[in-house]
């Protein structure tokens, strides 16, 4: 069995090989063990910041201000650059709030992110995170119409920043049914479990990527949200299996690797290697 000190040493050695900065925060919900390395340091949060937008949406739903079944009309002026598929659709069209949230997380759709951040309010989202004790989380832009012009020439933290500790604590609340309500947490976890990009935290793990389609209950399951742009890569999520259930966040920045964001990259490999080391230790594969 890998003891905490040995695991920390192993993860530290892996992180030391990176050309930039690496931050790790992992919380074993089965044993109570934590592993933290540079966990309070602020990193570009990129699209992982969308978890906080989803959280505030569910708080608003719980308060009765919004219903997941409400319809919103997406207009041409709402379309945003970057990741997602909605910008390719003919406008105007109607869609439910739940489906907007689903696309924001599952395919990281920026148009849907704009709609929900505008609906919830950027300042409200940040204030909610502060109320939860997440002080490094900061959504700096709501993806308004001028966002990409405003970010031109700036570093990627102009959009969003967070610490690995804050992300792990946020996902822990979701995983334990403590964010908003048990029902809301379950719905958020279900959405995260549909994320189509599992190849960073899940890169070296024995995951079945299409269990529903194959009709096979997954032995190991990842519920996550990643982010990528320029020199930054990050991934945060819950990993479950027969022997453990844990939350893990790995954030990287300032790499010298110039590769495009969803291609093979030093940051995504680093996330995968650290994830595998923690998986082996906490799932008993050592």
Model-derived regions: residue spans:
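Sec/Tat-exported extracytoplasmic proteins
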Residues: 15-18, 59-65, 76, 105-108, ...
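Acidic helix-start/capping segments at beta-turn-to-alpha-helix junctions
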Residues: 69-84, 120-121, 146, 191
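Active-site SXXK
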Residues: 32, 44-72, 167, 248
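Beta-lactamase-like hydrolase cores
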Residues: 1-41, 277
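Structured C-terminal helix/loop/strand segments within mature extracytoplasmic catalytic/sensor domains
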Residues: 2-12, 119, 170-209, 215-286
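Mid-domain, small-residue-enriched loop/turn segments at the edges of structured enzyme/sensor domains
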Residues: 117-179, 183
């Amino acid at each position: 069995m890998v003891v905490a000190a040995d695991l920390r040493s192993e993860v530290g050695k892996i992180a030391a090989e990176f050309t930039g900065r690496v931050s790790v925060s992992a919380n074993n919900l089965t044993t109570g063990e934590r592993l933290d390395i540079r966990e309070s340091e602020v990193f570009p949060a990129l699209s992982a910041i969308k978890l906080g937008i989803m959280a505030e949406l569910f708080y608003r739903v719980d308060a009765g201000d919004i219903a997941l079944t409400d319809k919103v009309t997406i207009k041409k002026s709402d379309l945003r650059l970057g990741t997602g598929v909605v910008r390719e659709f003919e406008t105007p069209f109607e869609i439910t709030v739940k489906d907007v949230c689903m696309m924001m997380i599952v395919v990281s759709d920026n148009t849907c992110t704009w709609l929900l951040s505008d609906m919830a309010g950027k300042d409200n989202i940040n204030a909610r995170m502060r109320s939860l004790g997440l002080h490094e989380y900061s959504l700096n832009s709501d993806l308004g119409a001028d966002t990409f012009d405003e970010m031109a020439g700036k570093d990627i933290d102009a959009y969003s920043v967070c610490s690995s500790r804050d992300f792990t604590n946020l996902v822990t609340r979701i995983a334990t049914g403590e964010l908003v309500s048990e029902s809301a947490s379950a719905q958020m976890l279900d959405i995260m479990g549909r994320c189509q990009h599992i190849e960073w935290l899940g890169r070296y793990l024995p995951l079945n990527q299409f269990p529903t389609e194959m009709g096979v209950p997954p032995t190991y399951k990842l519920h996550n949200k990643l982010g990528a742009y320029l020199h930054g890569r990050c991934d945060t999520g819950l990993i479950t299996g027969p022997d453990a259930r844990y939350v893990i966040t790995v954030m990287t920045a300032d790499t010298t690797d110039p590769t495009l964001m969803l291609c093979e990259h030093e940051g995504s490999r680093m996330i995968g290697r650290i994830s595998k080391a923690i998986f082996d230790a906490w799932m008993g594969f050592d």
